[in-house]
Structure formats: structure tokens, C-alpha cells
């Protein structure tokens, strides 16, 4: 599989590194051309402008841009017959998220959101215990962040952390909650 990464900021660089190590990275793209070129040189891959990324021979596009850009880039990628991995959040509202899900189904392409904590070994163990009934029937889940990491002014803390917590809670519950307080 050939991959292009769009967005070479803080988290995008991590994704670039991982796909490069897997040998699947073919293109990088960033709104700052000099950043894209430096990262492209570092990983020995080509760079291209956003408008051209959809015409490349890649199989999938990884989106690590600011959240406000996710919908339009993901939509264009799906319309170009590319599989899409988009960092959270998928979109800024339910209507856009549902439109992307419908488009991915129509195009028969994978649309995946980067809820990486779903694959963390500690979460997988907890999920196994819950699934096996080791905690009985879940009645209540409380979530508290112990490590907020690096504070970034360019994004809202709600968009940074809440999607991870919500995805894990839904993964444990296996259903949509009846109430949230």
C-alpha cells in the first residue's frame, strides 16, 4: 500500500515517521512548502501540493491537519478513490461526519479515525476484562485525565482529548449511553 500524509505538524511528523519505517510512505504535503520539503528530504519521499495529492498513485491518504480542514480533505480523498485515515476529530459536526461515512461506503473505501488509544495494551486488557464479565455489568464510567501533555494554543483542548476518552468509553460500553452527566 502506498500512503501520502497531509499535514506535517507535531502529530503529522509522527505519522510520517511511522509510515516511512513501514516502507509505505510515498508523498508528504504541508501548507508550509519548506516544511514539506524538509520532511520529504529527511524520509526520501516526494512532496506535492494539496490539490495534486488526490491525483497521485497512492492507495491511501493520511490527514493530520487542523480539525477544521478534515472534512474537505477527507471528502476530496474519498472522491478520488483513496482510502482515508484522518486524525480525530473526523469532522466538526455530525452532518459532515455522516456525509463522510456515507461517501466511504458508496466509494467502497476505508475511512478510519485515529483513535489510537483503542489499540493501547492497557485499554485492550480492560476491554477484555469488561467483555468477559470480570467487572459485571457496567453501570457508570468516570474518566479523568492525569497527563494533559503539551499544551498547544492552536487547538481547543476539547478537540485534543475528549475524542479519545469518548471513543474508549464507547468501546467499553459497547453501546451508546442513555445519559451523560
How does the language model describe each region?
Residues 1-43, 169-170:
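N-terminal Rossmann-like dinucleotide-binding module
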Residues 26, 59, 139:
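Conserved acidic residues
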Residues 45-101:
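Beta-loop-alpha module in the N-terminal Rossmann-like domain of NAD(P)-dependent dehydrogenases
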Residues 91-153, 165:
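A contiguous active-site-proximal alpha/beta segment in oxidoreductase catalytic domains
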Residues 148-181:
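Rossmann-like dinucleotide-binding domain that binds NAD(P)(H)
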